[in-house]
């Protein structure tokens, strides 16, 4: 069951400040959070809504940057049917794959970072969903060539540029939006859809542009508002869901 959100107007507080000021505040928040990441480049165990999640060095922490925790909190049995086959792309620690595996028949989690692949595998075992969750190494759809899914989850890099190390791959990359849009339909089942999480730290319009140009239907599925940041989960579906073959 899907719940599409209605369009929302800027809050009165936001309207009081010029766009340039809001952009500067947003940049300062982001730089402070990214500068502090070296402190967390260690083995830790986080609890995400009561679920233990191991985070190993160079793997994106779902609580420190909050996106993984927010996304995982939206994955439940009201959304994911018991017979669903799910793809979690850019899985990182595997937090969304673990939450999806509690509901779905099967989940494939993929990541380009070998450390993330190992970390997600640990979390599948830790949370006893290894019988329904498989982790693969590779870039975007490459590890699932020829496979289709009822639901595709993607928390993509939100900054453009060349990553300097494996950890930066979680939030910095080039050309991801175009490659994702090019291949999405070939990996969706009939009536399937993708959930895409984007942050105001990035440029949502730029990321959604290739999907719009290819005729996908885009709606707001969930939103979270924080100091200096808004997270939005978009539901992406083909213009003709019955036309996916």
Please report, for each region that a protein language model flagged, where it lies by residue.
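N-terminal auxiliary segments of SAM/dcSAM-dependent transferases
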Residues: 2-48
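Charged, low-complexity, helix/coiled-coil-prone segments
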Residues: 8-21, 57-67, 118-132, 149-158, ...
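A short alpha-helix capping/helix-coil boundary motif
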Residues: 21-22, 49, 54, 99-102, ...
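SAM-dependent Rossmann-like transferase core, predominantly class I methyltransferases
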Residues: 32-96, 119, 228-241
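Residues at secondary-structure transition points
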Residues: 62-66, 91, 111, 115, ...
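Conserved SAM/SAH cofactor-binding pocket of Class I
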Residues: 72-154, 160-161
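S-adenosylmethionine
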Residues: 114-117, 129, 134-238
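Rossmann-like AdoMet/SAM-dependent catalytic core
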Residues: 243-245
């Amino acid at each position: 069951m899907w719940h599409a959100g209605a369009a929302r107007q800027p809050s009165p507080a936001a309207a009081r400040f010029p766009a340039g000021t809001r952009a500067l505040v947003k940049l300062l928040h982001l730089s402070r959070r990214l500068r502090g990441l070296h402190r967390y480049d260690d083995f830790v165990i986080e609890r995400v809504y009561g679920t233990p999640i191991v985070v190993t060095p160079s793997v994106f922490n779902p609580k420190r940057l909050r996106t993984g925790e927010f996304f995982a909190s939206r994955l439940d049995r009201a959304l994911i049917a018991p017979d669903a086959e799910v793809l979690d792309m850019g899985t990182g620690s595997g937090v969304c794959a673990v939450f999806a595996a509690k509901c779905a028949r099967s989940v494939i989690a993929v990541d380009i970072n070998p450390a993330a692949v190992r970390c997600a595998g640990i979390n599948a075992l830790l949370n006893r969903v290894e019988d329904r969750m498989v982790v693969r190494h590779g870039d975007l759809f490459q590890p699932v060539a020829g496979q289709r899914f009822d639901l595709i989850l993607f928390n993509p890099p939100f900054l453009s540029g060349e990553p300097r190390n494996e950890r930066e791959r979680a939030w910095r990359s080039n050309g991801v939006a175009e490659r994702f849009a090019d291949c999405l339909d070939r990996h969706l089942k009939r009536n399937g859809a993708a959930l895409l999480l984007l942050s105001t730290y990035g440029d949502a319009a730029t990321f959604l542009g290739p999907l719009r140009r290819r005729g996908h239907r885009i709606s707001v599925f969930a939103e979270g508002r924080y100091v200096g940041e808004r997270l939005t989960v978009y539901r992406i579906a083909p213009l003709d869901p019955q036309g996916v073959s």
